Design a protein with these regions (language model features):
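Extended lipid/amphipathic-ligand handling interfaces
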Residues: 53, 145, 260-262
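Short acidic/polar N-terminal linker immediately downstream of export determinants
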Residues: 2-12, 19-77, 98-112, 283-298
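Short, surface-exposed interaction patches in beta-rich subdomains
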Residues: 61, 166-171, 175, 184-314
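Right-handed parallel beta-helix
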Residues: 33-41, 81-160, 165-174, 183-192, ...
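Active-site alpha-helical segments that house and flank conserved acidic catalytic motifs
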Residues: 46-48, 121, 140, 231
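Beta-strand elements of well-folded, non-transmembrane domains
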Residues: 50-52, 72-74, 99, 125, ...
Length: 314
């Protein structure tokens, strides 16, 4: 994926809560080995290689300086160190490891700075929180862990995660979301959303755009979607409330139910629904095999279920 301003690469090893709780193993016998409180001016970009550190960036359009607060705890003093350097308007932060062997450690870095900021973040484990950020393009590549986004504005918001949780709210931009195993919650998005998942749970609400979603195993819940696109659930249920049908609405399920409570006028659409084993319903019309309704519309809502039900009602 092409990245212009903001890139997040997170190769995480384990899932923790969204608070600061990242450990390389257990948190016994830890002592404070490093504390940082530094201020930097005229910073336009940052590169962070955080290792196991938890990372927070808090943007603010009313400030021009970057403040870095960091702490590092370990049961082996000298094993880890947070290094930082400013050069030509770029702030580099890196968690350094010395020698071999293992040890228990945890740490965090908390950054405040301008809302307009170029960021490049890498992390092996830990949690990432980004608040109040403006950019042309936002990308997050994750292995395993959690990410929380609030008030992010970008032409493209691209999130990929192998396993873990995504919580994103108050966003502007078209979002591409892909997660292998875990949960994703997106709310208050102005833009289109394309979401793909292998297993887990999707919850989307207040999306002012078109939503396409595909989930192999799990449940999808959607509320107040401006336009429904392609909804596919291989094994699980999809429940949609107070949302609008679109000119390209397609429903697919191998095993499970698709239930849609729509605010669209059903007479504005044709319907072509089929099921091998289950029931079909559009408004007051029902069928157990196939259900076709021709309202003379240029738009047709199509749906196929192998084993399960499709229900579309106002």
């Amino acid at each position: 994926m092409r990245l212009r301003q903001i890139k997040f690469q997170v190769l995480a090893l384990s899932i923790f809560g969204l608070g600061f709780a990242s450990l390389t193993s257990c948190e016994t016998n830890l002592e404070l080995v490093q504390s940082i409180d530094q201020e930097f001016s005229e910073i336009s970009s940052m590169e962070i290689d955080g290792g196991f550190l938890d990372i927070i960036y808090q943007g603010d359009q009313n400030i021009s300086v970057v403040n870095l607060i960091g702490t590092l705890e370990s049961n082996r003093p000298g094993k880890y160190e947070i290094e930082y350097q400013e050069e030509n308007g770029k702030l580099r932060i890196e968690l350094k490891k010395s020698g071999g062997g293992s040890g228990n450690a945890r740490g965090k870095i908390y950054l405040t700075g301008p809302a307009f900021m170029e960021l490049d973040i890498e992390s092996s484990s830990g949690n990432v929180q980004i608040h109040n950020l403006i950019s042309d393009e936002f990308e997050f590549d994750g292995g395993s862990g959690n990410i929380e986004l609030t008030n992010v504005s970008s032409n493209v918001i691209d999130l990929e995660l192998s396993s873990g949780n995504i919580v994103a709210s108050d966003l502007t931009g078209n979002m591409e979301l892909e997660i292998s195993s875990g949960n994703a919650s997106v709310s208050n998005l102005v833009g289109d959303l394309n979401a793909i998942g292998s297993s887990g749970r999707f919850k989307f609400s207040n999306i002012k755009g078109k939503v396409n979603t595909s989930l192999n195993s799990g449940n999808v819940t959607m509320t107040k979607i401006e336009e429904l696109g392609k909804l596919k659930v291989s094994s699980g249920n999809c429940e949609v409330v107070d949302s609008s049908l679109g000119e390209n609405t397609v429903l697919e399920s191998s095993s499970g139910n698709i239930t849609i409570n729509t605010n669209s006028n059903l007479n504005d659409f044709n319907f072509d629904l089929r099921t091998s084993s289950g029931n079909l319903r559009v408004g007051e019309s029902t069928s157990s095999g196939s259900l076709k309704i021709d309202n003379g519309s240029p738009y047709t809502v199509s749906g196929v279920v192998s084993s399960g039900n499709i229900q579309i009602r106002n």
